[in-house]
Amino acid sequence: MSGIFAAAIVMAAGMEASMAQEPASNLDSAKSRTQHLMGDIAPKLAELTDDVLYADIWERPQLSQRDRSLVTVSALIALNRPDQLRSHLVRAKANGLTEEQLVETITHMAFYSGWPSAVSAVAIAKEVFAEK
């Protein structure tokens, strides 16, 4: 099961910034962007992203979208995925996390995923926060 979870995180992390800028509740917009970004080259991946990630995982009631953003940002920091982190920081703010909470998450993750990952995350956060 952990392999499936890891694959879902990587799939989520691979979406471009424009997709993650939409609030998670805007499912139709997210689906159309998924199709636009990858549907012509990877239709099955686009379908799984729409039907599993956005329509199921992000909508499950066991975690709020704010909490899902916190989990996703933490995973992206741990995996040192700065390109995907940028878009998910935007999404995290849209889902109710504050800049202070996101910086605290980066600081906390430094002790679990390493200083280089945290330093990279701080640089990305600084750029995202400046784009207000």
Could you say what each language-model-derived stretch is?
Residues 108-110, 114-119:
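Substrate/cofactor-recognition hotspot
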Residues 84:
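Glycine-rich anion/phosphate-binding loops
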Residues 97-100, 105-106:
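Compact alpha-helical subdomains of small soluble proteins
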